[in-house]
Amino acid sequence: MFITFEGIDGSGKSTQIQLLAQYLEKRGKKVILKREPGGTETGEKIRKILLEEEVTPKAELFLFLASRNLLVTEIKQYLSEGYAVLLDRYTDSSVAYQGFGRNLGKEIVEELNDLATDGLIPDLTFYIDVDVETALKRKGELNRFEKREFLEHVREGYLVLAREHPERIVVLDGKRSIEEIHRDVVREVERRWKLDV
């Protein structure tokens, strides 16, 4: 069971991943939570660079890919040991943020993602969709025009991916309550894996 959570900052994905982890653990599943960028010792160093330093869009993409490649090795090991792996961001983030937001192009980012991940695709992705205005309000960044425009492109990237991969990506309305979103997450997980309740 490999599940990823996607969405722009302020969408509520980190909350939902924690709630799903608790839900699965209560049902006896071994659960591993990881995040991107990061998730490994070297990945966390890369995360620090990405958060603290100005880099070009291409350098940003390559740093994400390097972090992801290291993490995939661990994810494969956990999956082989029967863990449910829950990941806060994965390849769809790069397509949305670098491909659409930074305008590097969807196809090239997808090709590089495939190389970095050895083709490891999540079983299920929850994209928590929230409009940019709401996300910025939640993050306290309402007056950042350049951020707003960038995030509009990112959101569009996510929506394009959701339309292209409806069998994998479940779109959830991020404006609803935490409890309502969690109910939908649980319903979809139970539907796919027939968990004992």
From Swiss-Prot:
Function: Phosphorylation of dTMP to form dTDP in both de novo and salvage pathways of dTTP synthesis.
Descriptive protein name: Thymidylate kinase
SUPFAM superfamilies (UniProt xref): P-loop containing nucleoside triphosphate hydrolases (SSF52540)
Record GO biological process: dTDP biosynthetic process; dTTP biosynthetic process; dUDP biosynthetic process
Catalytic activity: dTMP + ATP = dTDP + ADP
GO molecular function, one term: dTMP kinase activity
Similarity field: Belongs to the thymidylate kinase family.
Keywords per UniProt: ATP-binding, Kinase, Nucleotide biosynthesis, Nucleotide-binding, Transferase
CDD domains per UniProt: TMPK
Assigned EC number: 2.7.4.9
NCBIfam families: DTMP_kinase
Signal peptide location: none
Family matches, as InterPro entries: P-loop_NTPase (IPR027417), Thymidylate_kin-like_dom (IPR039430), Thymidylate_kin_CS (IPR018095), Thymidylate_kinase (IPR018094)
Amino acids binding ATP: 7-14
PANTHER family according to UniProt: THYMIDYLATE KINASE (PTHR10344), UMP-CMP KINASE 2, MITOCHONDRIAL (PTHR10344:SF4)
Origin superkingdom: Bacteria
GO CC list: cytosol
Keyword presence, Amino-acid biosynthesis: no
One protein family per Pfam: Thymidylate_kin
